[in-house]
């Protein structure tokens, strides 16, 4: 099915049909767990019934896997054979942390105020004699190329960052960082869950990427993608082994451990069929609309919502960000206000947002609209906040 952004925005019937959550909710929580689209839910249901009544033909299943790899590879400028269909995001990040051949004294650069899944795999490397080097930006989440470059040394082996900070919404200039790291022969790992489906990504600037589908991709929990630069396969040993990623003819264990030559080497066992079918349907939507158009829409919505919230006296964390750093995340605070009460008021009115806290335990409210949200919904939010 083909999707048209203008039709989604201007035809309420189409919008309600394809994005059922819009029927009775104002959903502004896509940086958390996004609602499934009609297409994704239908794909999951169809697959469930198929394996209930008929058991899907193996050939059909592999055809769907290949189509999913193709869609995902187009989204990140990779090849289909370089896409592993695994989730959640933390699994891919841990594959990197555990698969690199570390030496005592090696350094990994990371941001300790990132989402925990992109912190613990790196800080835990102390057990292997690796030194985690913590980035300390002047403002939370604002990781700049200059900050990253200043943290490097002759012992830096990997830089592990998020393409977009989960709390502040600051979008990383990963391309500039990636170019400089390649010049120095330093590996670059990107947690892209807050960008996949919202922002164009090009893996030529990075070495590893991991992202689940349940946020901006509008897919199910636990279905995601993992990318590793194939040029690194010989020096990057998959740390998890099973019947799927190691050559096992006829499912018979072999004496020699020989990994597949494609990204299948990172898929250790039975595939998440239900999740992958849902993710495939969501990828079809993103592909049809075009991620560049989605990004433009999100920046427009960001500016609109930010302006409306500022008019009520809310402090918006992204108010000084350049446009290149804007995302679909608009996080606010208001000193002296009970944000728990504000969150409850919004929730009771059918507005879905996220209540979060910064490193100093100060409460924040995070809004994260997607392309199908309307400015009129923002006006309703403002009316609720005024009331």
Regions found by a protein language model. Give the residues of each.
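Pyridoxal 5′-phosphate
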Residues: 1-387
């Amino acid at each position: 099915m083909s999707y048209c952004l203008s039709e989604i925005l201007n035809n309420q019937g189409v919008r309600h049909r394809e994005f059922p959550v819009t029927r009775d909710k104002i959903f502004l929580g896509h940086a958390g767990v996004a609602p499934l689209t009609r297409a994704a839910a239908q794909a999951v249901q169809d697959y469930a019934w198929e394996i209930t009544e008929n058991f899907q033909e193996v050939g059909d299943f592999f055809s769907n896997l290949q189509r999913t790899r193709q869609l995902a590879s187009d989204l990140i400028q990779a090849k289909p054979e370089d896409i592993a269909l695994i989730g959640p995001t933390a699994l891919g990040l841990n594959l990197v942390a555990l698969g690199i051949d570390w030496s005592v004294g090696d350094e990994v650069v990371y941001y300790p105020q990132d989402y925990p899944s992109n912190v613990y795999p790196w800080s835990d490397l102390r057990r292997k004699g690796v030194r985690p080097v913590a980035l300390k930006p002047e403002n939370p989440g604002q990781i700049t190329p200059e900050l990253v470059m200043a943290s490097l040394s002759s012992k830096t082996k990997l830089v592990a960052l998020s393409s977009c900070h989960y709390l502040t919404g600051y979008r990383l200039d990963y391309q500039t960082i990636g170019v400089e790291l390649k010049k120095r022969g330093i590996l670059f790992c990107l947690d892209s869950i807050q960008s996949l489906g919202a922002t164009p990504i090009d893996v030529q600037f990075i070495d590893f990427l991991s992202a689940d589908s349940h946020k901006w991709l509008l897919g199910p929990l636990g279905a995601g993608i993992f990318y590793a630069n194939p040029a690194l396969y010989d020096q990057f040993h998959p740390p998890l082994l099973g019947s799927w990623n190691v050559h096992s003819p006829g499912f018979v264990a072999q004496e020699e451990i020989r990994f597949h030559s494609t990204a299948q080497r990172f898929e250790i066992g039975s595939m998440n069929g239900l999740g992958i079918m849902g993710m495939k349907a969501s990828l079809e939507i993103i592909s049809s609309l075009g991620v560049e158009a989605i990004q433009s829409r999100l920046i427009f919505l960001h500016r609109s919502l930010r302006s409306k919230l500022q008019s009520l006296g809310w402090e918006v964390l992204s108010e000084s960000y350049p446009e290149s750093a804007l995302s679909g995340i608009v996080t606010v605070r208001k000193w002296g206000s009970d944000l728990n009460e504000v969150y409850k008021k919004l929730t009771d009115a059918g507005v879905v947002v996220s209540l979060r806290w910064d490193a100093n335990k100060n409460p924040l409210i995070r809004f994260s609209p997607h392309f199908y949200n309307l400015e009129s919904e923002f006006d309703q939010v403002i009316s609720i906040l005024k009331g």
